[in-house]
């Protein structure tokens, strides 16, 4: 496992969820956080954290994200080729785009694409729009790219 300089990376919170457990004395709340980190130069990762308080969940998610960093192959400002990936019920389609197109991505796929440093890309999220699964499908698709 490589050590990364955390100052070089940006963090984006994709999703914060609240989970409720009903007990005899009332409701107990716990929080989950889904975070994406990237250096806008080919390194990107995601992490998932759970805790009783939101800041603790975010910290755990950021720590987890640095353990799951992948290197993305970038060709100019876009990706080298089309890729389609399925993760659980989510399908993700990534296509290279000509220069000047910009990032065409919705929901939780956009921060991953931007933090990876890709400037021009077409993406389509098919099937489930569960943010955790879309993030995992996008990361899986980016990891399958070959230069």
From Swiss-Prot:
One of its GO terms (biological process) is translation. PROSITE patterns: RIBOSOMAL_S5, S5_DSRBD. GO terms for cellular component: small ribosomal subunit. It comes from the Bacteria. One of its GO terms (molecular function) is rRNA binding. Belongs to the universal ribosomal protein uS5 family. Residues 9-72 form the S5 DRBM domain. With S4 and S12 plays an important role in translational accuracy. The N-terminal domain interacts with the head of the 30S subunit; the C-terminal domain interacts with the body and contacts protein S4. The interaction surface between S4 and S5 is involved in control of translational fidelity. Part of the 30S ribosomal subunit. Contacts proteins S4 and S8. Keywords: Ribonucleoprotein, Ribosomal protein, RNA-binding, rRNA-binding. Transmembrane segments: none annotated. Coiled coil: none annotated. This is Small ribosomal subunit protein uS5.
